[in-house]
Amino acid sequence: MSILLAVIMILVVVYVYRHRVDLGIVSPAGKGNEESTSSGIPASARPANIAWEALDRTSDGFKVEMPVEIKQIQVPAYNFQGGAEQVDMIYSYPNPETCFAVAWADEPPVERANSDVPDKTLDMARDDAMQRTETTLVSETPLSQQGFPARDFSARNLGGGVFNARLILARKRLYMLAATFPSVDARREQDVIRFFNSFNVVAGNQ
């Protein structure tokens, strides 16, 4: 699996976060994003109320449960040689500061690296994710997802934001599940577990 592929997939996640207003995911500043409870706690500092939806993406090789109002984008990301790679991603924002996303892409035809060393591919994807989200590793667990090499990791940034991810290398395709939260208080462990454990690789266009 190409190192470039791992980098490209992280760029998609960062793209969605940075352009969430332009994409219509949240309202511009001053349009209600600072709603508070009666106790004065900002809406972004408490767990989102999530309604889940079972999603069958067999044509893309997977099934998963995600928060409702799922959207999809395809973002052109450019590799170090100037070539464009189209990366697919589905995502949902149950509140303005909480995001659940799945990105996937196949191995590029050129610039392959570490094709026979899954652990190195997952290491590179993890390290680049933390670099680009400006987070520091908190915990990490190697695992097997239906017999495929996978990796769970959790990271945080200086502002208290939490980034949870699961990387799955299924044959020649790399999947990345990501859940991001503005703070530890806004993160609910059972939501992350439900999201990650609902993901299944199925026969499709792999």
Task: Spell out what each predicted region is.
Residues M1-S2, R20:
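Short, low-complexity patches enriched in S/T/P/G
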Residues S2-Y15:
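Hydrophobic membrane-insertion alpha-helices, especially the h-region
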Residues T58, F62, P67-Q72, V117-T133, ...:
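Surface-exposed amphipathic alpha-helical segments
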Residues M89-D119, M176-L177:
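A short acidic-to-branched-hydrophobic micro-motif
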